[in-house]
Every structure is written in C-alpha cells, then in structure tokens.
C-alpha cells in the first residue's frame, strides 16, 4: 500500500511537494531542539488549500494519520510524528505567503506556513507591529 499512497501523493503535489528519503525528510522529523524524533511514510508540502484538501481526503480514505507542521519551531514536539513510520507529515512551509495586510482594520490574512519573523518584518515596514 505504501507505494500506492506515495504515487497518489505525488500526483497531488508533484516532485517539489513530496519527500520520502531519509536524507530529504530528516529535518522535518526532528523537532527544533532535537529532543523528539519520529518517522513518516512521507513528507508532503502542498502549495495550495486545494492540495491540502486532496491530501487529507486521501489520508482519510486510507485511515492514515496526518501530522501537520508549520515552521517546526515549537517547543513541545507536537509537530513531530511518532516513531511508527506510517503517518503523513503535512508540512505547510510552502504555503508561506502574506495575502493581505489591512492597516485600517489592523488585520492580516496569511497562509498557514508563514513564518512569524516574516510577519513581524513585513508589518514593521508599514509602521505596524505584530
């Protein structure tokens, strides 16, 4: 089943959005402090919400656990999969755009993988603070 799942994931996110080898996935499978380490069937890096939806539908259809991961900078290891190796790690790093900053309403719309430092730097250039 693993080969079928990998092929289906590849069809959704393409070469740039799929990592399966140990060397390619290592940085995703260890937390920021190096305290927690896990394994996964694949690291999937969608670029759109449509791709996220397709990955989630595939995982649901095959009863596969999905571990979401933003920047992997958390302190608790919650974005690190367990050691079973049968989950999909859903990295949102490629969904890193700032869609809108509305200075009047003091709000912004950003994608899930947008790094906090980027938000801070971008708003600071506009005389705002995040």
Regions from the PLM with identified roles:
Residues 1-32, 39, 61-64:
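N-terminal accessory segments
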Residues 18, 28, 75, 98-101, ...:
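Short clusters of hydrophobic/aromatic residues that line enzyme substrate/ligand-binding pockets
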Residues 23, 70-72:
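Short, ordered loop/turn segments at secondary-structure junctions
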Residues 76, 88-91:
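Short, acidic (Asp/Glu-rich) active-site segment that either coordinates a divalent metal cofactor
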Residues 80-82:
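Extracellular beta-strand-rich solenoid/capping regions of secreted or surface-exposed proteins
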């Amino acid at each position: 089943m693993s080969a079928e799942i990998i092929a289906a994931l590849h069809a959704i996110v393409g070469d740039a959005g799929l990592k399966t080898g140990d060397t390619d996935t290592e940085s995703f499978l260890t937390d920021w402090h190096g305290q927690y380490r896990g394994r996964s069937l694949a690291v999937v890096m969608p670029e759109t919400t449509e791709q996220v939806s397709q990955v989630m539908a595939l995982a649901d259809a095959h009863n596969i656990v999905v571990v979401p991961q933003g920047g992997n900078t958390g302190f608790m290891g919650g974005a690190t999969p367990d050691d079973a190796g049968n989950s999909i790690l859903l990295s949102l790093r490629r969904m890193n755009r700032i869609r809108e900053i509305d200075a009047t309403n003091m709000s912004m719309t950003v994608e899930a993988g947008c790094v906090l430092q980027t938000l801070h730097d971008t708003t600071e250039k506009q005389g705002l603070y995040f």
